[in-house]
């Protein structure tokens, strides 16, 4: 009796497919790039959760690590204080936050969930500020609570934590980065 082993089919994230099939071509036409490799693309997404109160209570960092693990799908790295600051009762090496760097398919799936599920769940959401680019096509924005992600059970959170999300692109200018993120579905506020 012989058995055939089936290799698991690799599922490509839908936003990555959309980028490859439609967005790449439209950006190349819009900015008239000579080479397809000049078209801006996503490099990585960094999700950072600062827990300043962890200086007083070190157990708070565990909740941030747990939340970030659920949101990003990978174990975050704990950020430790580089310098001691007496006014904040902070010592060098104390845990003060956590961050996770997403690349590849995890990054595409996170951006898809962020744009299509998490951002629409924010109360009184009017769109992201389009002026928070760094001058090199990278975009950073903050979220005030972690409850908007459907992976987080609203009854099990110990406290509300905000987070910073940085989207790093290969765009050379802010306009190119904004066009890429808008094509990926980021809801920017309309300029009045």
Curated annotation (Swiss-Prot):
It comes from Paenarthrobacter aurescens (strain TC1). The lineage of its organism: Bacteria, Bacillati, Actinomycetota, Actinomycetes, Micrococcales. Part of the 50S ribosomal subunit; part of the 5S rRNA/L5/L18/L25 subcomplex. Contacts the 5S rRNA and the P site tRNA. Forms a bridge to the 30S subunit in the 70S ribosome. This is one of the proteins that bind and probably mediate the attachment of the 5S RNA into the large ribosomal subunit, where it forms part of the central protuberance. In the 70S ribosome it contacts protein S13 of the 30S subunit (bridge B1b), connecting the 2 subunits; this bridge is implicated in subunit movement. Contacts the P site tRNA; the 5S rRNA and some of its associated proteins might help stabilize positioning of ribosome-bound tRNAs. It holds the Pfam family Ribosomal_L5_C. Belongs to the universal ribosomal protein uL5 family. HAMAP family: Ribosomal_uL5_B (MF_01333_B). One of its GO terms (molecular function) is rRNA binding. Keywords: Ribonucleoprotein, Ribosomal protein, RNA-binding, rRNA-binding, tRNA-binding. GO terms for cellular component: ribonucleoprotein complex; ribosome. This is Large ribosomal subunit protein uL5. NCBIfam families: PRK00010.1. GO terms for biological process: translation.
